[in-house]
Amino acid sequence: MIEVIVNDRLGKKLRVKCLSTDSVGDLKKVLAVQLGTAHGKVALHKGGVNLKDHISLDDYEVHDGTYLELYYL
């Protein structure tokens, strides 16, 4: 179990617990529930790279304590 910190750059920082084997799409669905928006309306970035939904967090080297940027589409 890892904890990922997501910053939406509007003042919200969310801490989300997930598995490193979860896909980016799974993480976006959890975030969408917490934010009250549709998961298709958010994008996650790490180091300026847009994370694709079907790839696992481990493949993007997202580990415990990793910061991700959240953008609203």
Swiss-Prot record:
The keyword Ligase does not apply. Keywords: Ubl conjugation pathway. One of its GO terms (molecular function) is protein tag activity. GO terms for biological process: mRNA cis splicing, via spliceosome; mRNA splicing, via spliceosome; protein modification process. Residues 1-73 form the Ubiquitin-like domain. One of its GO terms (cellular component) is cytoplasm. This is Ubiquitin-like modifier HUB1. It comes from Eremothecium gossypii (strain ATCC 10895 / CBS 109.51 / FGSC 9923 / NRRL Y-1056) (Yeast).
